[in-house]
UniProtKB/Swiss-Prot annotation:
Subcellular location: Nucleus; Cytoplasm; Cell membrane
Subunit structure of this chain's protein: Homodimer.
Protein name: BTB/POZ domain and ankyrin repeat-containing protein NOOT1
UniProt GO MF annotations: transcription cis-regulatory region binding; zinc ion binding
Record organism: Medicago truncatula (Barrel medic)
BTB domain boundaries: 25-107
C-alpha cells in the first residue's frame, strides 16, 4: 500500500467516526435544532479553538451562549452544547475537514438549493455555491481552522471568475471585512472591468469601496494607454478610449432615464445617438429595476430584442422575470413575444426556473432564500409561462401539419391518417401538460407549514447520520488534501 493510500484509508477511518454518530462520542452539539455527535480528542487535536474550549482555563465564548465551561479534567459534560454562530450544513462541512483533512465546498450537482433557480445547475459558481463558500469561510475563521480558510479562499477565487457581478461584489465585501488581500484584488478588478456605473454600484457597495473601484479604473485606463504602440497612428488609442468613455456615458444616461421613467429620452438616444439597447442591456436592466410601464414602453419602441441573451449565462429578460417571480413582468414580456422555451448557456428555460421554485415550495416549505416569494404570484407566473409554451407548441404542430399537407400528393389518401394521429397525439399531450400544470401550481396554495413540519420530524441522530451519508462522501470524493 502506497503512502497516499494509507493516508486516504486513515482519513476515511476518522470520517467514519463522524458518520456513525453516537459511536464512541463524548460531546454533542445542537445546530439549528439538530444534534451532532463528535469526539473531543479529535476536535482538540485539530483546532486551537476547541482545545481551549474543552481544556483551557479560559474557553472562548460564543460556541455555548449559556456560559457552561468544561472542567480541566475532561470529564463528560452534562447537556448539549448549542451552536448559534453557524448553520448545520456549514458546521458539518467544517467537522468533515477536521476529521478527514479533506472537503469540497461545493453543493452536490443538480441538488435543489433555496437560492438557485436553475434546474440541473452544477453549483460551481452560482449564488448558492458562493453563499456556501462565504459561510464556510466565516466559520473557518471563527473556529480558527486556518487551513480550511485558505482552501475556501482559493475556492472563492476560482468561483468569482465565472460568478455573477452581484456575487462578485458580495465576495468583495467579505474579503475586505476579513482582510483577504488576494481575494480583494481579484474581485475589485472584476468589478472595475464590469463597467457598472457608480450609481449602480452604490446599491451594493459602500461609498469608500466605490471610490477605490473608480481609482482602479483610472489606473487601469492609464496603464492601458501606456502599453499601446505609439509608432503609428499616435492618437488612435486616444480615439478608442474616448469612444469607450462615450459609450459608458450613454449607458449611464440611459439607466438614469429608465430609473426616472423617461422612455422618451431613451428613444431620442436610440434615434439621434445610435444607442444599441441590446448591447446596453436596457431591457434586462428595466425588468430588474423599473416598473412594468417602463418595460412596456421600452418594448414598444421596437429597438430591443425581447429574447436577447445577456451576459455569460445567456439569460433573457423572461429568465430574469421568472427568477423575480413577477407576474407583471412575465405578462408584458410574453405579450411582446418573449420565447418561454429559450434556453440559457446551461440549457435552462424560464419554465425550468419556475418549476424548480415551485418544487422548493411544495417539498421544502418556507426556506431561507424563498421567503420573499408569494405563492400566489409564483402560481400565476407558472400558469402564464406554461400556457405560452403550450400555445407555441400548438402553433408549431399546426405549422408542421400544414407543411405535411402541402407536400402530400392528392392521390395519397393514407396521408390523412398520420395527420389525424398527430393531432390526436398532440391533443393528448396538451391535455397531459395541462393536467401536470394544474397539479403543480394549484398545490402552491396549500399550507406550506406541512412541508416545514415534515422537515422538523424524525430522530436527530438518524437525521445527522443521513445528512452526513448523503453529503459527506460526496464532498470527500471530490476533496482536497491538507
Amino acid at each position: 500500500m502506497s503512502l497516499e493510500d494509507s493516508l486516504r484509508s486513515l482519513s476515511l477511518d476518522y470520517l467514519n467516526l463522524l458518520i456513525n454518530g453516537q459511536a464512541f462520542s463524548d460531546v454533542v452539539f445542537s445546530v439549528e435544532g439538530r444534534l451532532v455527535h463528535a469526539h473531543r480528542c479529535i476536535l482538540a487535536a485539530r483546532s486551537l479553538f476547541f482545545r481551549k474550549f474543552f481544556c483551557g482555563p479560559d474557553p472562548p465564548s460564543g460556541l455555548d451562549p449559556s456560559g457552561n465551561r468544561v472542567n480541566p479534567s475532561g470529564s463528560a459534560r452534562s447537556g448539549v452544547i448549542p451552536v448559534n454562530s453557524v448553520g448545520y450544513e456549514v458546521f458539518l462541512l467544517m467537522l468533515q475537514f477536521l476529521y478527514s483533512g479533506q472537503v469540497s465546498i461545493v453543493p452536490q450537482k443538480h441538488e435543489p438549493r433555496p437560492n438557485c433557480g436553475d434546474r440541473g445547475c452544477w453549483h460551481t459558481h452560482c449564488t448558492s455555491a458562493v453563499d456556501l463558500a462565504l459561510d464556510t469561510l466565516a466559520a473557518a475563521r471563527y473556529f480558527g481552522v486556518e487551513q480550511l480558510a485558505l482552501l475556501t479562499q482559493k475556492q472563492l477565487a476560482s468561483m468569482v471568475e465565472k460568478a455573477s457581478i452581484e456575487d462578485v461584489m458580495k465576495v468583495l465585501l467579505a474579503s475586505r471585512k476579513q482582510d483577504m488581500h488576494q481575494l480583494w484584488t481579484t474581485c475589485s478588478h472584476l468589478v472595475a472591468k464590469s463597467g457598472l456605473p457608480p450609481e449602480v454600484l452604490a446599491k451594493h457597495l459602500p461609498i469608500d469601496i466605490i471610490a477605490k473601484i473608480e481609482e482602479l479604473r483610472i489606473k487601469t485606463s492609464l496603464s492601458r494607454r501606456s502599453l499601446m504602440p505609439h509608432h503609428h497612428h499616435p492618437h488612435h488609442h486616444d480615439h478608442l478610449t474616448a469612444a469607450a468613455d462615450l459609450e459608458d456615458q450613454k449607458i449611464r444616461r440611459m439607466r438614469r432615464a429608465l430609473d426616472s421613467s423617461d422612455v422618451e429620452l431613451v428613444k431620442l438616444m436610440v434615434m439621434g445617438e445610435g444607442l444599441n439597447l441590446d448591447e446596453a442591456l436596457a431591457l434586462p436592466y428595466a425588468v430588474e429595476n423599473c416598473s412594468r410601464e417602463v418595460v412596456k414602453a421600452l418594448l414598444e419602441l421596437g429597438a430591443a430584442d425581447v429574447n436577447f441573451p445577456a451576459g455569460p449565462t445567456g439569460k433573457t429578460p423572461l429568465h430574469i422575470a421568472a427568477e423575480m417571480v413577477s407576474p407583471d413582468m412575465v405578462a408584458v414580456l410574453l405579450d411582446h413575444h418573449a420565447d418561454p422555451n429559450v434556453r440559457t448557456v446551461d440549457g435552462v428555460t424560464p419554465l425550468d426556473i419556475l418549476r424548480t421554485l415551485t418544487s422548493d415550495f411544495l417539498f421544502k416549505g418556507a426556506v431561507p432564500g424563498l421567503t420573499h416569494i408569494e405563492p400566489n404570484k409564483l402560481r400565476l407566473c407558472l400558469e402564464l409561462v406554461q400556457s405560452a409554451a403550450l400555445v407555441m407548441s400548438r402553433e408549431e404542430g399546426n405549422n408542421n401539419n400544414s407543411n405535411n399537407n402541402n407536400n402530400a400528393t392528392a392521390s395519397s389518401a393514407t396521408n390523412m391518417y398520420p395527420h389525424h394521429n398527430m393531432n390526436e397525439d398532440h391533443h393528448h399531450s396538451h391535455n397531459n401538460n395541462n393536467m401536470d400544470s394544474r397539479l403543480v401550481y394549484l398545490n402552491l396554495g396549500a399550507n406550506t407549514q406541512m412541508s416545514t413540519s415534515r422537515m422538523d420530524s424524525g430522530d436527530d441522530d438518524n437525521t445527522h447520520r443521513e445528512a452526513i451519508n448523503n453529503s459527506m462522501y460526496h464532498h470527500h470524493s471530490h476533496g482536497h488534501d491538507y
